[in-house]
Design a protein with these regions (language model features):
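Helical "lid/coupling" subdomains associated with nucleotide-phosphate turnover
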Residues: 218, 250-285
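Phosphate-binding loop and its immediate beta->loop->alpha context
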Residues: 23-141, 211-212, 217-262
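Conserved A3 ("GATE") glycine/threonine-rich loop of ANL adenylate-forming enzymes
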Residues: 11-15, 151-155, 182-183, 204-210
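Active-site nucleophile and cofactor-binding loops and adjacent substrate-binding regions
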Residues: 32-35, 147-153, 202
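Gly/Thr-rich phosphate-binding beta-strand-loop-beta motif of the actin/hexokinase/Hsp70
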Residues: 2-29, 163-195
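Phosphate/ATP-binding catalytic cores across multiple sugar-kinase/actin-like superfamilies
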Residues: 93-111, 152-167, 281-285
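Short beta-alpha connecting loops at secondary-structure transitions
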Residues: 194-202, 223-227
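Hydrophobic, small-residue-rich alpha-helical packing segments that form membrane-like cores
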Residues: 134, 141-164, 168-173
Length: 285
């Protein structure tokens, strides 16, 4: 009897990725949900009287909605790090993962978790409570009995399979650093086994999202009240400012002497943001 096919899930704070692999050979294939890229945004949009939307579609719908529409919408993102201590975050995670299965059915993507061995990556420094909660969330969402795997193992295997690092070097001892959207995970691996891990389940890229939000408000102090009145504070804080952070990063990668500018919806602009200004704010954050 051939080995059972695998469905692997990288359930991230900002983006979530799905990968299918036959049971008899190592040939993983990422799942494209229609955006010409693997994965989708970890987001869910609850709509009064309508089916919830997930992924990039949820963010786009909220971004394009009128103020009247937004009064009937609830957008949730970045809930993964809070699933242990927050019932709301746990419920959002369940509904998001349910929504992925429904989206896959509608697009005939055949995730078929009940017919596959399902594994979900978790930060190596995560404790047993977090891992247990992840498996419970997945089971409640319809994925069956799920096994968790330390994310650094998947990261290292990916780099070895793509030729980024020789397998012989990978076995000697490797430090894997995963600075994700919600967590910061360090793992020292020897012969493919995590020997030591450390980091923080609360530190990650979302701290920079918040820093850029504060930077924007320093330059546009009148914007906050208008955001709150329009019900936009969450969307601007965690979505638009994340986009601004990512664009700033690309700009600085190209040329750190360049001054960065970015409009944030109808609420104003970040102007003349510099690398030195970023470093100064990051040190003081």
């Amino acid at each position: 009897m051939s080995a059972k096919a695998v469905l692997a899930i990288d359930f991230g704070t900002v983006n979530t990725y799905f990968c299918k692999c036959p049971g008899d050979k190592i040939s993983p294939v990422g799942v494209d949900f229609g955006k010409n890229r693997d994965g989708l945004a970890t987001a869910i949009l609850y709509r009064k009287g309508s089916t919830a939307l997930i992924g990039d579609t949820a963010l786009e719908e909220y971004g394009d909605a009128t103020n009247d529409d937004r009064n009937t919408y609830v957008l949730r993102t970045q809930f993964k790090p809070e699933i242990v201590g927050s019932k709301q975050a746990r419920d959002d995670a369940v509904e998001f993962l349910k929504g992925v299965l429904e989206e896959a059915r509608q697009q005939n993507l055949a995730l078929s978790p009940t017919e596959r061995k399902v594994i979900i990556g978790v930060p190596s420094e995560s404790d047993s409570t977090f891992r247990k909660t992840v498996t419970e969330v997945a089971k409640e969402a319809g994925y069956g009995e799920v096994r968790t795997v330390d994310e650094p193992k998947g990261a290292l295997l990916n780099h070895v399979s793509h030729g980024d690092i020789p397998a012989t070097d990978a076995l000697k001892g490797v430090l894997v650093v995963d600075f994700g959207g919600g967590t910061c995970d360090f793992a020292f691996m020897y012969r493919g086994v995590v020997r030591h891990s450390w980091g923080d389940m609360a530190l990650g890229g979302r701290l920079f999202d918040d820093m850029f939000f504060r930077w924007f408000l320093d330059e546009n102090p009148e914007a906050y009240r208008r955001m709150v009145d329009n019900g936009d504070e969450f969307f601007v804080h965690w979505c638009l400012c994340r986009e601004m952070k990512e664009k700033f990063s690309r700009t600085m990668t190209r040329d750190r002497s360049e001054a960065f500018k970015k409009a944030v919806g109808e609420y104003g602009r970040l102007t003349e943001a510099t690398w030195d200004g970023f470093v100064s704010r990051a040190k003081a954050y």
